[in-house]
């Protein structure tokens, strides 16, 4: 029986960073209190010529290069984002031409807050498993924004991750997946509103923890896994505290979670958040390692996946594609004024 799973991965993090203390300086907040509250030292900021599309293209190109895959063999492209440059125009169709795919591709932009990219992973897995396409790709990409002066501004950031699914040359074999979803009003943005709103008390227990724990625990109970079975565990990372607490609630040792933590250095990249942690782990994983991946999306829902790393990962790690750790270290600090300019938050005229 052929394997099914992640054949290749690629990530992109913009080089620019704004530090938490710089944002807090502008708004008169205590930087030590803010850093302690969110465990976010700095966050990534897209360049003046970057958006969710360019970030997706770069992440996808890196995934294709790492896997040595003929892009014409990719038969499905899914994009998960909350940051579409166009209100009505898909990113997925742009990727088809930018990446050199054929026109006979299933292409869809997906929406479910920060877990839409992982929903694309589910869809790609289904098409590949059914034999409808040879390879499927999902991309989680965002240039997330928070209202200036509001606490979401300390974490909302930019980045993208692409995963290619197939049966040939699998680097991380899929073993199981599970979902937990409910109608929970923890986070939303109405049509025409420039910035999202969040339901304060709904964001923790009723939303993130209920769904992340529900998906992870449900998967483990259904398929007979124990915390000790996993080498690495990666959760969605809206801040630095939530994934650590989720691990504690599941009796998962912190040393299994820390290698996949990226939020401290780049903030919450939304659809790329959990996938970025997953990519970071794949950059260092060894054959036989088992990974539990649990993305989360407000509204609310969580997907859970278990992958086992294969011998192929060693070749993928040698392809000269930038690692997540390398991108975390390759940075240029900007001040708050530059940050506003890059994020196009200064309106010169309407």
Swiss-Prot record:
Documented EC number(s): 2.3.3.10
Disulfide bonds: none
Alphabetized UniProt keyword annotations: Acyltransferase, Isoprene biosynthesis, Transferase
InterPro entries, per database record: ACP_syn_III_C, HMG_CoA_Synthase, Thiolase-like
Positions bound to CoA: 241
Record field: catalytic activity: acetoacetyl-CoA + acetyl-CoA + H2O = (3S)-3-hydroxy-3-methylglutaryl-CoA + CoA + H(+)
CDD domains named in the record: init_cond_enzymes
Residues that bind (3S)-3-hydroxy-3-methylglutaryl-CoA: 30, 114, 155, 203, 236, 245, 268, 298
Alphabetical list of Pfam families matching this protein: ACP_syn_III_C
Single GO molecular function: hydroxymethylglutaryl-CoA synthase activity
Keyword Transferase: yes
Pathway assigned to this chain's UniProt record: Metabolic intermediate biosynthesis; (R)-mevalonate biosynthesis; (R)-mevalonate from acetyl-CoA: step 2/3
Active site per database record: 82, 114, 236
Single GO BP term: isopentenyl diphosphate biosynthetic process, mevalonate pathway
The protein's role, per its UniProt record: Catalyzes the condensation of acetyl-CoA with acetoacetyl-CoA to form 3-hydroxy-3-methylglutaryl-CoA (HMG-CoA). Functions in the mevalonate (MVA) pathway leading to isopentenyl diphosphate (IPP), a key precursor for the biosynthesis of isoprenoid compounds that are building blocks of archaeal membrane lipids.
Similarity field: Belongs to the thiolase-like superfamily. Archaeal HMG-CoA synthase family.
Subunit structure and binding partners: Interacts with acetoacetyl-CoA thiolase that catalyzes the precedent step in the pathway and with a DUF35 protein. The acetoacetyl-CoA thiolase/HMG-CoA synthase complex channels the intermediate via a fused CoA-binding site, which allows for efficient coupling of the endergonic thiolase reaction with the exergonic HMGCS reaction.
Name assigned to this protein: Hydroxymethylglutaryl-CoA synthase
């Amino acid at each position: 029986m052929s394997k099914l799973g992640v054949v290749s991965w690629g990530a992109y993090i913009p080089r620019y960073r704004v530090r938490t203390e710089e944002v807090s300086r502008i708004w008169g907040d205590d930087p030590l209190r803010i850093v302690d509250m969110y465990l976010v030292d700095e966050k990534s900021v897209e360049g003046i010529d970057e958006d969710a599309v360019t970030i997706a293209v770069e992440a996808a190109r890196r995934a294709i290069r790492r896997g040595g895959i003929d892009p014409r063999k990719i038969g499905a492209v899914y994009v998960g984002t909350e940051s579409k440059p166009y209100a009505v125009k898909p990113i997925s169709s742009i990727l088809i031409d930018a990446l050199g795919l054929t026109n006979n591709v299933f292409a869809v932009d997906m929406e479910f807050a920060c877990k839409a990219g992982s929903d694309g992973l589910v869809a790609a897995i289904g098409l590949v498993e059914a034999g409808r396409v040879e390879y499927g790709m999902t991309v989680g990409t965002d240039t997330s924004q928070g209202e200036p002066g509001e606490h979401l501004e300390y974490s909302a950031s930019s980045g993208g991750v692409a995963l290619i699914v197939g049966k040939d040359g699998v680097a991380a074999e899929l073993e199981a997946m599970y979902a937990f979803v409910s109608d929970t009003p923890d986070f939303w943005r109405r049509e025409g509103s420039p910035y999202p709103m969040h339901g304060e008390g709904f964001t923790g227990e009723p939303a993130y923890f209920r769904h992340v724990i529900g998906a992870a625990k449900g998967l483990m109970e259904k398929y007979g896994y124990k915390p000790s079975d996993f080498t690495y565990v990666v959760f969605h990372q809206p801040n630095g505290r939530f994934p650590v607490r989720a691990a504690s609630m599941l009796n998962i040792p912190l040393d299994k979670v820390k290698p996949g933590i990226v939020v401290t250095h780049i903030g919450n990249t939304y659809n790329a958040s959990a996938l970025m942690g997953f990519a970071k782990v794949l950059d260092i994983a060894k054959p036989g390692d088992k990974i539990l991946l649990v993305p989360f999306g407000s509204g609310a829902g969580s997907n859970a996946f278990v992958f086992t790393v294969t011998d192929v990962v060693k070749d993928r790690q040698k392809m000269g594609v930038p690692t997540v750790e390398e991108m975390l270290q390759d940075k240029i600090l900007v001040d708050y004024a530059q940050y506003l300019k890059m994020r196009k938050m200064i309106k010169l005229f309407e």
